[in-house]
Swiss-Prot record:
<feature type="region of interest" description="Disordered">
    <location>
        <begin position="283"/>
        <end position="366"/>
    </location>
</feature>
<keyword id="KW-0238">DNA-binding</keyword>
<feature type="compositionally biased region" description="Polar residues">
    <location>
        <begin position="307"/>
        <end position="319"/>
    </location>
</feature>
<dbReference type="GO" id="GO:0043565">
    <property type="term" value="F:sequence-specific DNA binding"/>
</dbReference>
<dbReference type="InterPro" id="IPR036576">
    <property type="entry name" value="WRKY_dom_sf"/>
</dbReference>
<dbReference type="GO" id="GO:0003700">
    <property type="term" value="F:DNA-binding transcription factor activity"/>
</dbReference>
<comment type="function">
    <text>Transcription factor. Interacts specifically with the W box (5'-(T)TGAC[CT]-3'), a frequently occurring elicitor-responsive cis-acting element.</text>
</comment>
<keyword id="KW-0539">Nucleus</keyword>
<keyword id="KW-0805">Transcription regulation</keyword>
<dbReference type="Pfam" id="PF03106">
    <property type="entry name" value="WRKY"/>
</dbReference>
<keyword id="KW-0804">Transcription</keyword>
<dbReference type="InterPro" id="IPR044810">
    <property type="entry name" value="WRKY_plant"/>
</dbReference>
<feature type="DNA-binding region" description="WRKY">
    <location>
        <begin position="211"/>
        <end position="277"/>
    </location>
</feature>
<feature type="compositionally biased region" description="Acidic residues">
    <location>
        <begin position="340"/>
        <end position="354"/>
    </location>
</feature>
<comment type="similarity">
    <text>Belongs to the WRKY group II-e family.</text>
</comment>
<protein>
    <recommendedName>
        <fullName>Probable WRKY transcription factor 14</fullName>
    </recommendedName>
</protein>
<dbReference type="InterPro" id="IPR003657">
    <property type="entry name" value="WRKY_dom"/>
</dbReference>
Amino acid sequence: MCSVSELLDMENFQGDLTDVVRGIGGHVLSPETPPSNIWPLPLSHPTPSPSDLNINPFGDPFVSMDDPLLQELNSITNSGYFSTVGDNNNNIHNNNGFLVPKVFEEDHIKSQCSIFPRIRISHSNIIHDSSPCNSPAMSAHVVAAAAAASPRGIINVDTNSPRNCLLVDGTTFSSQIQISSPRNLGLKRRKSQAKKVVCIPAPAAMNSRSSGEVVPSDLWAWRKYGQKPIKGSPFPRGYYRCSSSKGCSARKQVERSRTDPNMLVITYTSEHNHPWPIQRNALAGSTRSSTSSSSNPNPSKPSTANVNSSSIGSQNTIYLPSSTTPPPTLSSSAIKDERGDDMELENVDDDDDNQIAPYRPELHDHQHQPDDFFADLEELEGDSLSMLLSHGCGGDGKDKTTASDGISNFFGWSGDNNYNNYDDQDSRSL
């Protein structure tokens, strides 16, 4: 049977952990009951002494460590949320005669350090710890351990400010670790290449019709592998690569300035990985045509004849579609170079959205000869001499005379003079 006092006490329960402990213990506080007879609760095992806590017989570093959950509960009791044994009697009567003592004694707490640190991570990738402790004895070990854990991180150790404590072999040390996130490695390689822009006056065009791209000589051998139209400019942009060395990654772009068309804007990308070429190799590519034309401004007639004969010979060697002999095939290295240039031209990093047209030389119309070139020509008839001699050599002398007269007239001989000479010779012989 429950007494009346117990029923009155149950009405004053607040439904917290203290009411559960009070109900299990069955202790009802009254003004006559001294508080020291109730709390603290008897422990199931004796409290070890501080000297026993430092003993580590089996080499286990977790023997002398406390439970972090118990430490959290102890901090709650220290905050004043629960009343303790040392409260005044006025507070006891105001709380309907009940006493909520301290749950855990301070003898169980060795220090405020814990193996489980409380970490606060900020947006600046700095890891802060919130428990107050300062022991700079093992700061060097912190740097070595953190550097081995994160080789890309930046580690800063602050031994002057109180930080969270980590227990290693019975000693404590504090640290502040700052880990920087690695840089974004997904950027394009072309972005990291250094570019150099040079503005020079555009040289005069060699022919009367000025084109948008006149490349000056810069003592390097360049080869053009493409061009691209520019928005807002009537002149295209040319793309060149170094042809002095096969593995050279040097590139340049040549275009007219949008503000001043008389200026050329040359953008150099990457550096040459080879020495300066000799003068003969430097004339390769776009420079060779300009120097050759300037060195021989007035060609003579024999050179023109040689050019005509060479052009005729080249026309004779053109392989028509109807011919049975296949044309000579290109080498595999030349094909690979052309494919590499096309792929590189497609990967050019530029803001324009126009399509890049690869550079290809145009074929002239005279090189394509039709098959019916000799169709309008007629075959020659029989020989004219056979026609003249077809009258026959037999018959009277009159026919022979007319035939001989026809032959003499054909070769421009006079028949009368010949006959007169023959008569004179006969008379002299007689």
